[in-house]
Amino acid sequence: MYKKLAIATLLYSADYLPGVFALGHQVNKLLEEAGKKGDIETCLIVTTSLFNDTLSELAKNLLQSIYTKIVLVEPLDCQEESIQKNSENLALLERPELSFALIKARLWELTQFEQVLYLDSDTLPLNKEFLKLFDIMSKQTTSQVGAIADIGWPDMFNSGVMMLIPDTDTASVLQNYIIENTSIDGSDQGILNQFFNQNCCTDELVKDSFSREWVQLSFTYNVTIPNLGYQSSPAMNYFKPSIKLIHFIGKHKPWSLWSQKNFIKNEYHDQWNEVYEEFKEEHQLNNEVSKPKISDSDKTETPETITPVDAPPSNEPTTNQEIDTISTVEENVDNQNAEPVPNSDHSPAPNPVPLDFTKWLTTFINKDHLTNQPVNESREYSKENDNNIINSSSNRDQESPPNSTQEPNSSYSVVSTQADSDEHQNAEEEDSTTDNASNSGEESHLDDISTAASSNNNVSNQPDNKNFSNSKENNISVEPSPSNPEQKRSTDNIQKPSVSTNDLPDDVEPHTSVDDNIQYLEKDKEGYEEFLPDVYESNAIDNEEEFFDDDARDATEGETKTSAVADKQEDMKLTAEETNQPQQEMPNFKFDWEDSDYLSKVERCFPDDIFEYAVE
């Protein structure tokens, strides 16, 4: 063993001052426990500007009481140029404060010691077994460095724990190497590996003749935590009794604000806090400053002036003035670390629904129409679909011919109960015009129906005459009074909108021609009953007319004046008048659904949240 041995650490930022306090306290405790208090010195390397301009007198006194030797050093020559050159690689680590760690090359200038064990200020020796490194590296040379493999890349060593031999020549060559080359990681660990580690030589010829050597030591002398998934839990549990030293790597240290609030603490984190509490108690520090609040934020500039403790009362004005300045800096650091309060005034405004979209939504999905319908209408409609019972005679009493004063598809639309009184009055005033148009067009319409019925009579299944008679008798409607043109005529939901038929002759029955589109849908009506109720009903009406045979027409002729045969015979007399009346094209029931109850049947198929925007 060498005569002059030292355990050294480095302080290049005031943010690491709590770590320097805890490390020095723990090392002294373990040296005393091992009985080597006088054999191994403790040394602190600190930059001159930090010690003289930043630290308070109390901090200086505490450091001098912990470490037997404090060495003030200056930054490396051309350090600013080196930092600028290594900035790109250093950005990969997202640790800008490590740019000042290049001063670690000054360790080889400690020629007053024969061998040095270097420990980062964020390390914590757990027991005195870590002192065995001096025995393991007792034959170390100046060209060797003893270190532990880095968990992120095991072919490289971690520079947080190193055994080295101070040497002036090695220090000079190393510092020149730092100036001339770019560090792998932009910091001290990369450049020291490039200088001492043969694994970093990409040239095989140079690697074989490499003059320096990395001596790999056991991982138990530098267990880095947290390892963020790299750590093997079984191995950690197995080698736990053999661990000599813990290294708190990463941005968040045990003394940082983030770690104190958010970090998932483990037993080693708790051990560091216990050591710091012992340090505080031994030096009788105020409880209010026992846990310095150091910012976790990355710094791109020189570290600010911060002290972790308040000075005791003193009569020296210069000391009090310095302490006040440092306290102000601590308050600023607290404000920087405070979480910002969310401002409700700047909360993002809700995205309003465009007006066009609102109109589109209310046009296609009219829920008021569905809610205003009587309940019995929907029940009766469902019953009709189930039993397929449609009364042709009663439907004819409620159908109106197309004319220029009516809207398309009004013959098959359910009139809303909320119609304005003005519309009723206007409809009554147009009755005379409507009656004339209907009388003139009856003969042509019934001729079309008769032709369609005769062509399809052979392929259609005729219904039972008895059942038809009963259905007709049960559903026959009564002639409404002139004062109520809007009154419901039958139970099949088919009404005449705003047109009174009280002036029609008893022997004339209006009827509407059949459109080709209805015949097309009738062929494929299976499965469409629920979605196309109006079309289905109109087809059923026309088909029922096709089912009548000659005997059925004769039987119904004597029972009522509103039968289909009587209407046909009466309308055929008006052929001459009908030729003078222009034929109006029937609406396309495939698309003219706005005035029908089509939406009231299909709207329930859409869930409430089908649209992306919510209409307020």
Swiss-Prot record:
One of its GO terms (cellular component) is vacuole. Residues 283-320, 335-354, 371-516 are annotated as: Disordered. It comes from the Eukaryota. It is an enzyme of class 2 (transferase). Residues 283-302, 377-386 have a biased composition (Basic and acidic residues). One of its GO terms (molecular function) is glycogenin glucosyltransferase activity. The record marks 104 as: Important for catalytic activity. Its cofactor is Mn(2+). Residues 400-419, 462-485, 492-503 have a biased composition (Polar residues). The keyword Lipoprotein does not apply. Induction: Induced during the diauxic transition. Its EC number is 2.4.1.186. Signal peptide: none annotated. GO terms for biological process: glycogen biosynthetic process. It is found in: Cytoplasm; Vacuole. Belongs to the glycosyltransferase 8 family. Glycogenin subfamily. Self-glucosylating initiator of glycogen synthesis. It catalyzes the formation of a short alpha (1,4)-glucosyl chain covalently attached via a glucose 1-O-tyrosyl linkage to internal tyrosine residues and these chains act as primers for the elongation reaction catalyzed by glycogen synthase. Capable of transferring glucosyl residues to unbound acceptors such as free oligoglucans or oligoglucan derivatives. This is Glycogenin-1. It comes from Saccharomyces cerevisiae (strain YJM789).
